[in-house]
């Protein structure tokens, strides 16, 4: 894939992701309210948000974090993967931050917001079907885009 095509995809991804509604007023929301906004149990919400924080290396933009969360949510809905957030995140060979214990990090409002936005985007039904991401390159599926050092692939 050419550099110009990757840049075009990255710009398209960034523009599309930023079409979300106003930020959630996190200073006034409880963890229970945040989980409800995402349509998840508190346990699932905390787990996915912690993994998003760890996988993002605490440095990715909201766009990158949304795509990481969306990858997890999409896997739960895909027949080729386990049926729950916990099972997807604990699946052997996936999400190295879970396997090596690095997902035991403090969540941030930033990762919480990313999970909520990903869940909203998925619920709206017009989200990309990203199922894979890595920092090495496109190695499976169809290239979706490159955001914050990660390549995202659709199935």
Protein language model annotation of sequence segments:
Residues 25-155:
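Bacterial extracytoplasmic/cell-wall-associated proteins, especially those involved in peptidoglycan
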Residues 1-39:
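Cell-wall glycan-active module
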């Amino acid at each position: 894939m050419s550099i110009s095509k990757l840049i075009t995809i990255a710009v398209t991804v960034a523009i599309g992701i930023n079409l979300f509604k106003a930020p959630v007023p996190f200073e006034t929301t409880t963890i229970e309210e945040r989980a409800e906004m995402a349509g998840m149990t508190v346990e699932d919400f905390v787990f996915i948000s912690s993994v998003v924080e760890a996988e993002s290396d605490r440095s990715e933009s909201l766009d990158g974090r949304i795509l990481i969360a969306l990858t997890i949510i999409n896997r739960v809905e895909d027949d080729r993967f386990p049926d729950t957030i916990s099972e997807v995140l604990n699946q052997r060979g996936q999400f190295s931050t879970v396997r090596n214990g690095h997902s035991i990090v403090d969540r941030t409002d930033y990762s919480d917001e990313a999970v909520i936005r990903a869940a909203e985007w998925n619920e709206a039904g017009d989200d990309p079907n990203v199922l894979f991401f890595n920092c090495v390159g496109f190695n499976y599926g169809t290239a979706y885009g490159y955001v914050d050092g990660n390549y995202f692939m659709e199935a």
